[in-house]
Amino acid sequence: MGNTFGHLFRITTFGESHGGGVGVIIDGCPPRLDLSESDIQGDLDRRRPGQSKITTPRKETDTCEIISGVFQGKTLGTPIAILVRNKDARSQDYNEMSVKFRPSHADATYEAKYGIRNWQGGGRSSARETIGRVAAGAIAKKILKQVANVEIVGYVKRIKDLEGNVNPDTVTLEEVESNIVRCPDADMAEKMIDLIDQTRRDKDSIGGVVECVARYVPRGLGEPVFDKLEADLAKAVMSLPASKGFEIGSGFAGTLLTGSEHNDEFYIDDNGNIRTKTNRSGGIQGGISNGEHIIIRVAFKPTATIGKEQKTVTSESEETTLAAKGRHDPCVLSRAVPMVEAMVALVLCDHLLRWQGQCQVLT
């Protein structure tokens, strides 16, 4: 249970961190979409470990294989299966964690729920599970771009107390990818990199915020009342490992304003379209996209697995200490960027298909 996401564009991820591989089954992809591994590999490369000194040193190529659902370079409309094989697992690094629970990790709760857990690399709770999401998200991005010209760009907004100055209306993928921390503010990016590197040397971890903008989203996406667009976006990104908070538009800061200050006033643009002068709603009103840019923020906690000694307990309820071994991210933010983009793309693609299926039948 809990491994499937979406309605019409539906994905099921599978695999564990130290198993034979990880992947995804995608059901509901429209037929006749041009698709090859190269359409997917770019985003997987952005997500993969071992990219730089501020990520885990685990070395994986994360090479994807499409094993069903595509024929002669086009989707068939049948389930698409994508597999990425694990190549560099070092399970012996986790021997101590077979009995000791990592503080603030999923170890203890998985044990409590299932009565058994895969302690090698965290199993299903590992961020390696997100490979399937990113692969499926790459396909969703391609559909959104081809059908509606939607652009999705994520970036690191904040690391600990260091916050970048980024304009979501104009930021480009090239600017995001110009440095290893994926913060388009070049000056702040250098400070972020230094902070993460120092944290790594201290055997500790830090968190931060990823911001993501979806531009040119058509008006009308969202299914009130329980499947409002922002509700599905919140569920999507809050299902990512280490996520702890969600905001859209003005977010919590909007509570400091009055209605007259917060309302996005309407006007008619030169093309006769209804637009808003401001975008404090974040592109969604009443749970439905309004045609403005959708802007969300996701908070990620500091990585739970750290090399500093901490107090914990064993599966036999004995108090002990743990200084985790193995290879872990001192900060997940730079690798979380393509994960957030993927989840946003999956939600928007699913809602685009739902909108067309319901609202475009009778024109």
From Swiss-Prot:
Enzyme class: lyase
One cellular component term from this protein's GO annotations in UniProt: cytosol
Keyword tRNA processing: no
EC nos: 4.2.3.5
Keywords: Amino-acid biosynthesis, Aromatic amino acid biosynthesis, FAD, Flavoprotein, FMN, Lyase, NADP
Binding locations of NADP(+): 47
Keyword Endoplasmic reticulum: no
Biological process, per Gene Ontology: amino acid biosynthetic process; aromatic amino acid family biosynthetic process; chorismate biosynthetic process
CDD domains hit by this protein: Chorismate_synthase
Pfam families, sorted: Chorismate_synt
Alphabetized GO MF terms: chorismate synthase activity; FMN binding
Annotated InterPro entries: Chorismate_synth, Chorismate_synth_AroC_sf, Chorismate_synthase_CS
Region (Disordered): 36-58
Cofactor(s) listed: FMNH2
Highest rank taxon of the organism: Bacteria
SUPFAM superfamilies, per database record: Chorismate synthase, AroC
Family under the similarity heading: Belongs to the chorismate synthase family.
Quaternary structure, from the entry: Homotetramer.
HAMAP family for the chain: Chorismate_synth (MF_00300)
Cited function: This reaction introduces a second double bond into the aromatic ring system.
UniProt cross-references to NCBIfam families, sorted A to Z: aroC, PRK05382.1
The protein, known as: Chorismate synthase
Organism the protein comes from: Crocosphaera subtropica (strain ATCC 51142 / BH68)
